[in-house]
């Protein structure tokens, strides 16, 4: 089987990636070939020592998203130091041509691969000519005069601008985790919350604050509930230095302990702040709930 393929980390599988992948899909259909997105189980940046890189997707989410945009095959390579030491030509010969059967390679407008990432598009075209691989340059996806990139989206999330991040992603940014035991302070105030444990370092957390969210129970459940979520240190109830994620689901009753939840971020309502009393906190939560109920996007 021969393929039209592209390669990259595809962190986020955002609108920029989607433009590139649509080019791959269209070209594959024109040539009567299969479409392939080649990616990595672990980010090359993490393997090469950039431990501060926190990703937008888990590997499982990335695989699902790549298939949803029309890829027939999504090989997840194990990126190693040995692979990092391969020249671009050797990688094209040994991995793309011989291992994966790539006939046409679509290169992202700013993507580089191979030892030291020193080669560029013209080099890939030359190697491809020698190896029998057609090399095509992908088009950039620009939003408000700036290319859509994973770095740009991470900045939005780090600053709490989740609606902008979701626009650039083309879908709502989400976190999934298991409901664990909490302090039950919210329940006493009439706002029972589910405390969500997210695997540390697996995905980027938005800035501390209160957010309007959609909630799926059992992670892959079909129905979505409206909720409001707090990320932070709960200063009013003295949670100390521990950062927590807790969500209140509107108009829902039931025991969620031990269940898997996925929350989709819609809009940031406000920053987390300290209140003088629990009564003041309760009044603010009522105001937050009313605002969430009025949001047209929910």
Locate predicted features.
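Glycine-rich, Lys/Arg-enriched anion-binding loops that position phosphate/diphosphate groups
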Residues: 128-230
């Amino acid at each position: 089987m021969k393929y039209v393929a592209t390669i990259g980390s595809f962190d986020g599988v955002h609108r920029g990636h989607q433009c590139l992948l649509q080019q791959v899909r269209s070209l594959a259909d024109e040539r009567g070939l299969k479409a392939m997105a080649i990616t990595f189980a672990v980010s090359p940046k993490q393997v090469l020592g950039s431990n501060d890189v926190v990703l937008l997707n888990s590997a499982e989410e990335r695989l699902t998203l790549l298939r949803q945009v029309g890829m027939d095959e999504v090989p997840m390579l194990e990126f190693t130091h040995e692979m990092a030491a391969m020249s671009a030509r050797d990688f094209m010969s040994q991995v793309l041509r011989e291992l994966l059967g790539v006939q046409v390679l679509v290169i992202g407008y700013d993507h580089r691969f191979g030892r030291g990432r020193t080669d560029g598009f013209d080099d890939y075209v030359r190697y491809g000519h020698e190896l029998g691989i057609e090399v095509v340059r992908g088009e950039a996806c620009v939003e408000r005069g700036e290319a859509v990139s994973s770095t740009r989206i991470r900045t939005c999330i780090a600053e709490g601008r989740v609606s902008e991040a979701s626009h650039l992603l083309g879908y709502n940014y989400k976190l999934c985790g298991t409901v664990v035991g909490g302090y039950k302070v919210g329940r006493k105030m009439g706002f029972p919350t589910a405390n969500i444990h997210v695997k540390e370092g697996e995905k980027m957390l938005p800035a501390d604050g209160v957010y309007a969210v959609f909630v799926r129970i059992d992670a892959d459940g079909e129905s979505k509930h409206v909720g409001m979520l707090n990320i932070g240190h709960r200063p009013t109830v003295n949670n100390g230095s521990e950062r927590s994620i807790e969500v209140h689901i509107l108009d829902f009753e039931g025991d969620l302990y031990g269940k898997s939840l996925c929350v989709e971020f819609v809009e940031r309502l406000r920053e987390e702040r300290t209140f003088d009393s629990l009564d003041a906190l309760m009044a603010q939560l009522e105001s937050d709930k009313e605002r969430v109920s009025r949001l047209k996007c929910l």
